[in-house]
């Protein structure tokens, strides 16, 4: 049995120094090919207007835009400091005309019903203050037939995998945050139970050595 979840902050990553460290870490993951752009695309999210929840510095969504044609993206993040970094990175990518970042949380998204062709997120699920409500909001803003991709760490990963992630995390200042994220993450069984009485109940939950994933369609 894994240890009980230790709930992490739902206030987002704030502070110029902290945000800069996180941006450096995410940029290194991108450069190593360790962000999940291919997984998002392989899930069928390849066209139209997508919503990314918790984009952080923006690399997953920006890489998705880079590798798809004619797509548009809105990023929803609670952190003003992180949005500023994401906007700077979008400018670096030359993609400012295709992406807009909005400051809000997932409990009451500032978007119309049936607005998006897809919703995706990586690494934010464990931070959601009211995950069931956020899942229902995802369903609300999706068009009929719209696709869903949610991925995150898993709390019950093998100790060896946790050690590997810890040692691979650079800069080293990010390591305490990694551990707190793992401790707050869901197991695949917990995620299956969590979605049972939400609009995402028909979605598929799967796992790998370090993470959990939810995919489906409206």
Regions from the PLM with identified roles:
Residues 107-118:
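A short acidic, Gly/Pro-enriched loop at the edge of an enzyme's catalytic core
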Residues 132-144:
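A short glycine-rich, Lys/Arg-flanked "PGG" loop and its adjoining helix->strand segment in the class I
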